[in-house]
Amino acid sequence: MAANNRSDHGSDENTRLYNPYQNYEVPINKSQYLYKLPTSPEFLFTEEALRQRRSWGENLTFYTGTAYLGGSVAGASVGVITGVKSFESGDTTKLKINRILNSSGQTGRTWGNRIGIIGLVYAGIESGIVAATDRDDVWTSVVAGLGTGAVCRAARGVRSAAVAGALGGLAAGAVVAGKQIVKRYVPI
């Protein structure tokens, strides 16, 4: 990036001035080393700038990570309750803590892996639908939820896959509707 003169600093309102030497005590004429940096993300094509969507890789990482984290926390909570219920009358405090930690760790890992896989499948189906239709709306999420439920229960038979698909579609629709309600009525 070339250095800019002082005369054209106010010409573009979508930029900010940046001085790379502002934090250093160096004997350099700082006014000639002011650079105009954009304040918004840069895109090669204007169509990319109009889309407010994560890429398929970011989508995959986000949904899988969020699902794994949520499943691990929920599983650890259930594991704590299971560990507390498994106390015996002669257990020492050290043994009780050990039971709680073992139970919460095992259940947290199991739930995290299972729900993380569901997030992975959902993200893959949703990204595939968006790539095929070039649309991202409520129905994309509902169809992705339907497909995720069906894929995750396909090994148990057609009836189980159909029920799980319907539940997945309803769950995805409820989440999207809740997100829209929060955007509209909750001032953030």
From Swiss-Prot:
What are the transmembrane regions? 64-84, 112-131, 138-154, 161-178
Q: Where does tissue-level expression of this protein occur?
A: Expressed in roots and young cotyledons. Detected in leaves and flowers.
Primary site of residence:
mitochondrion
Q: List keywords of the entry alphabetically.
A: Membrane, Mitochondrion, Mitochondrion inner membrane, Transmembrane, Transmembrane helix
Gene field: TIM23-2
Read off the domain note.
The C-terminal part (143-188) is required for insertion in the mitochondrial inner membrane.
What organism is the protein native to?
A: Arabidopsis thaliana (Mouse-ear cress)
Q: Does the keyword Transmembrane helix apply?
A: yes
Indicate the family of this protein.
Belongs to the Tim17/Tim22/Tim23 family.
The protein's matches in PANTHER family, at most eight in alphabetical order, are given as: SD19278P, TIM23
Question: Any idea what job this protein has?
Answer: Essential component of the TIM17:23 complex, a complex that mediates the translocation of transit peptide-containing proteins across the mitochondrial inner membrane. Links the inner and outer membranes.
**UniProt signal peptide:** none
Any Gene Ontology CC annotation = mitochondrion
Its membrane topology is listed as: Multi-pass membrane protein
Please provide the Gene Ontology terms (biological process) for this protein: protein import into mitochondrial matrix
Its recorded name reads Mitochondrial import inner membrane translocase subunit TIM23-2
* GO MF, one annotated term: protein transmembrane transporter activity
Where is this protein localized, as stated in its record?
Mitochondrion inner membrane
Subunit: Homomultimer. Component of the TIM17:23 complex at least composed of TIM23, TIM17 and TIM50. The complex interacts with the TIM44 component of the PAM complex. Also part of the NADH-ubiquinone oxidoreductase complex I. Interacts with OEP163, TIM17-2, TIM21, TIM50 and MPPA2.
